[in-house]
Regions:
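Hydrophobic helical membrane-anchoring modules
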Residues: 90, 95-117
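Conserved core of the sugar-phosphate nucleotidyltransferase
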Residues: 3-92
Length: 117
């Protein structure tokens, strides 16, 4: 994984939900409060909101954060990690926003780790 940081008890709590709800897969997501848009012909086109819309009034959106995937073995043998009816397990923790792709990302993750522990 490109994010080795995990909130304490994430696996235990997520696995409990996975078993309780009887899904065949689970993946973690995090709420998104950013105002996304596209740049087309040097113009910004809002994608997830309307100009002037307050952040707190945005439609709740989520992103796959890559912290944890739980999948039944039979699905993995079919090259399926996230099934159509997978449980999106919400994790809103500082670690969910860390993605280590560069040295700067690694330095930031190390800083967070030291600060938290």
């Amino acid at each position: 994984p490109t994010n080795p940081l995990r909130p304490e008890n994430l696996l235990k709590d997520a696995f409990r939900a996975y078993e309780r709800e009887r899904y065949d897969s689970l993946f973690t997501v995090t709420g998104n409060d950013k105002k996304f848009g596209k740049i087309v012909d040097n113009k910004f086109i809002p994608f997830t909101y309307k100009i002037g819309q307050r952040s707190q009034d945005l439609e709740p959106l989520f992103f796959e954060n890559g912290l944890l995937y739980i999948t039944k073995a039979k699905l993995i043998f079919e090259d399926i990690i996230i099934s159509k009816d997978a449980l999106p397990y919400e994790v809103n923790h500082t670690f969910a926003n860390v993605d280590i792709d560069t040295q700067e990302d690694f330095d930031y993750a190390a800083f967070l780790f030291k600060k938290m522990y």
